[in-house]
Amino acid sequence: MSVCYRPPGNETLLSWKGSRATGTAFLLLAALLGLPGNGFVVWSLAGWRPTAGRPLAATLVLHLALADGAVLLLTPLFVAFLSRQAWPLGQVGCKAVYYVCALSMYASVLLTGLLSLQRCLAVTRPFLAPRLRSPALARRLLLGVWLAALVLAVPAAVYRHLWGDRVCQLCHPSAVHAAAHLSLETLTAFVLPFGTVLGCYGVTLARLRGARWGSGRQGTRVGRLVSAIVLAFGLLWAPYHAVNLLQAVAALAPPEGPLARLGGAGQAARAGTTALAFFSSSVNPVLYVFTAGDLLPRAGPRFLTRLFEGSGEARVGSRSREGTMELRTTPRLKVVGQGRGYGDPGGGGRMEKDSQEW
């Protein structure tokens, strides 16, 4: 792509020193926290094979850690890019690296949305709990997530270009292409998944507050975890997608108007907002530690598996199975009473009465 649409001002993502410095700091912090954190999650869950089947939530968290860890492995490359102000891998590397970033972004947000939907079903439809442990279901869902992410990430590679052999950034053939691409990315990678997360967690919290086992300490613990996940997701991704929308609006605005000039400012701010989105890949392991911190003294390094063994899905499913057992064993208790009636002539009438009452 030889001719690229550029907003007024000829700004690039390396133009603002403050954005470069902020981006570098966020990338370093993300790598410091996220690489060992996600590595620990993968180590803890990959080899866990409970006899009842791995909970779907644990499988989704495992793949979420894989997606986050993959993009965090690229942080040294981006730190070098921002600090040296030159892209080191050429045109092919420019497209390939940003494709991996987009793939990880879509996989992460889709897995987060699917995880919130799973938690909602585990609370509102407890009879589905055994089915949610099905390995076949997990394989189908994960295949769909990764295939969707592979397809949705394609524009990130198509619209990346190495400018002047030193800046790897977006290159659209026209303003219409820029507006369409950036708007679609925000819709599919933020608006729809974030709306799903908010809706599912809203339903889950409403159900937990009204349920007997949702009150007290456990209800507070679940509520804090839900609030932290939603807050982190929204805060860390919102600036990136705000820049997307700003540039999309600027691309369609009159070239000499104030909105068009804001597109250049958004381009210059992209380094910092992209690095902040990178930081979202390191947050989830920290949230798991805060959620299951009381399990550390008892479970040690395997506290994460203990967390999912005692998750809401397991408890609700257990309660559902216990309720089924009560219904099945009640007639047997009546039969025991009937057996005593054979030795007692008066027992037969009571046996028939009890059976009819049940």
Curated annotation (Swiss-Prot):
Extracellular side: 1-24, 82-96, 162-185, 247-275
Residues with glycosylation annotation: 10
Family: Belongs to the G-protein coupled receptor 1 family.
Membrane topology, from the record: Multi-pass membrane protein
GO biological process terms on file: keratinocyte migration; neuropeptide signaling pathway; signal transduction
Function: Low-affinity receptor for leukotrienes including leukotriene B4. Mediates chemotaxis of granulocytes and macrophages. The response is mediated via G-proteins that activate a phosphatidylinositol-calcium second messenger system.
Protein name: Leukotriene B4 receptor 2
GO molecular function, one term: leukotriene B4 receptor activity
Ion transport listed as a keyword: no
Gene responsible for this protein: Ltb4r2
Composition bias, Gly residues: 338-349
Keyword Phosphoprotein found: no
One Gene Ontology term, aspect cellular component: membrane
Cell compartments where the protein resides: Cell membrane
TM regions (residue ranges): 25-45, 61-81, 97-117, 141-161, 186-206, 226-246, 276-296
